């Protein structure tokens, strides 16, 4: 029975540019979450993909957030500059070019953390400097 439904059970993938156009046309439709499964560190990917971030910038999307992007170089740069300061970044895309090129621009350092937090389980071991930056 499942075999007969296999085509109906396939995910409907949409180009991120089309999603951004839809979201920008319907800003009051509620929260939109983009999940880039191809850059999932739980599956062994580097977690430094910039495709979604670059699409948000290109679409002039307001209110977007990239949850996690592994970039120790930019985190160190943000920590050196301090909260409230602006830094010139080359964010993400440093492991390879499969998940997007580095995003270059000015970024405001919003907040910093030393990476200490409570988590039970094998993940997140060795997390160090964290930063929240706003790309302009």
Locate each region found by the language model:
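Active-site catalytic microenvironments in core metabolic enzymes, especially phosphate/sugar-handling
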Residues: 1-4, 8-26, 30-33, 37-131
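Conserved small/polar residues in nucleotide/adenosyl-binding loops
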Residues: 133-135
């Amino acid at each position: 029975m499942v075999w007969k439904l296999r085509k109906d059970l396939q995910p409907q993938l949409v180009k991120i540019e089309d999603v951004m156009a839809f979201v920008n046309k319907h800003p009051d439709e509620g929260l939109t979450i983009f999940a880039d499964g191809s850059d999932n560190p739980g599956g062994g990917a580097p977690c430094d993909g910039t495709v979604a971030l670059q699409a948000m910038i290109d679409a002039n999307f307001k209110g977007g957030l990239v949850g996690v992007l592994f970039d120790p170089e930019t985190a160190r740069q943000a920590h050196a500059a301090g909260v409230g300061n602006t830094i010139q970044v080359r964010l993400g895309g440093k492991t390879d070019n499969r998940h997007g090129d580095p995003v270059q621009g000015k970024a405001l350092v919003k907040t910093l953390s030393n990476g200490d937090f409570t988590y039970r389980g094998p993940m997140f071991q060795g997390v160090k400097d964290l930063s929240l930056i706003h790309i302009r």
